[in-house]
Amino acid sequence: MDQKKDPSNNLTERRVSKVQRPNKKKVRNQVESLSRNLERNKEGQLLQTVSKGHLKADSGHSLGREKENGELGIRSIFYDKDWNPRGTAPSHYRNIPYNPATFKRRTEVQARLGNLENIKIPK
């Protein structure tokens, strides 16, 4: 007998026969595992929606990254008359109003040389 005609030696014939005549026990096990996976996915989606709800509730109190970049002008902590006159926040950061009680601006920069004041600088 030819090897191509013999179904015991032909791999494609065996694969096709398994699909055409499936084993009931294997099919039942596959259906059960798929139903368990579906239940787990539903539980995971429920947890994700609860987490998203908590995230939305906490987003109003966040001092970190934010999508909107409002300009506060001179009231912003990011304001600088030379570098940032509009007071815009860096990308992905929230713009916070300046509070003089908690944040002190330096009006001028003073060099802190310590004991190095005696060194002569070449011209």
UniProtKB/Swiss-Prot annotation:
One Gene Ontology cellular component term attached to this UniProt record is: cytoplasm
Q: Which cysteines are joined by disulfide bonds?
A: none
Top-level taxon of the source organism: Eukaryota
Whether Ribosomal protein counts among this entry's keywords is no
Question: Where does this protein reside within or beyond the cell?
Answer: Cytoplasm
User: Locations of Basic and acidic residues compositional bias?
Assistant: 1-16
UniProt region (Disordered), positions on chain: 1-30
Keyword check for DNA damage: no
Ranges of compositional bias, category Basic residues: 17-28
Write down a Pfam family by its short name. Answer: NpwBP
Q: Which UniProt keywords apply?
A: Cytoplasm
Q: How does it assemble?
A: May interact with the nuclear pore complex.
Annotated family: Belongs to the AIM4 family.
What protein am I looking at?
A: Altered inheritance of mitochondria protein 4
Species whose genome carries this gene: Saccharomyces cerevisiae (strain YJM789) (Baker's yeast)
Q: Which gene encodes it?
A: AIM4
